[in-house]
Amino acid sequence: GFNNGVDCAAMPAIAAWDHYITTGDIQLLYEMLPGIIKYAEEADARYDEEMQLIHATMCLAQDAFEEPENGGYCLGTEITFALMYQDVAKICKVTGCYLERIKFWENRAEEMFTSIKEKYWNEEKECFTSGPIGSEAYEKGWWETTGAEMVLWPRFGIATERQRNLFLKTIESNPEAFSEFGI
């Protein structure tokens, strides 16, 4: 759950949906559905209506300790939970289960993606920061590996082309930002 890596609750839905769209194996969706719903409901309990984000104090790249500079909402973790909600809704549609919750989870995913785009892009620093507006990370223009990589990939639909280009230039201007392992 939330105590075994901050993204643990989000990953089953994402993995199950990726498996389904790759293989067409719907049986796995039915087998995993009870756990997927349990984790979605746990995430619902941690959802901050005002921020439109999941309270997540640890980032995906390092979930052994809390990162207070992110203000309680780490970017990569937020993206992962938004994807989880999106995929939970898709799984429910395909399986015909929990039909009454589909719109709720679709809306939650959309709210989170909108909030991420609005709260994490720092125009002055030309980057997506690891924490939202008001956090130390936002004020100082700090980013974290996983969140940075996720916003840059067009697959996730976070950064606009302009933001992507600016952020890549910002990363390139920091010689210590790149390693042989990634950002």
Language model region names:
Residues L53-I54, F128:
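Short clusters of hydrophobic/aromatic residues that line enzyme substrate/ligand-binding pockets
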Residues E49, L60, E123:
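Residue-level signal for pocket-adjacent positions within structured domains
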Residues G1-L53, C74-A82:
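Aromatic-rich carbohydrate-recognition surfaces in CAZymes
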Residues A9, Y30-E41, P68, G72-K103, ...:
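Active-site core of glycosidic bond-cleaving carbohydrate-active enzymes
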Residues A13, L60-Q62, M84:
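Short hydrophobic/aromatic-rich motifs at helix boundaries and adjacent loops
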Residues Y47, M58, P132:
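Short, flexible helix/strand-to-coil boundary loops that buttress conserved ligand/catalytic motifs
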Residues S115-Y120:
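Short amphipathic coiled-coil heptad-repeat segments
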Residues G1-F2, A56-C74:
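Acidic/His metal-coordination segments adjacent to aromatic residues that form catalytic metal sites
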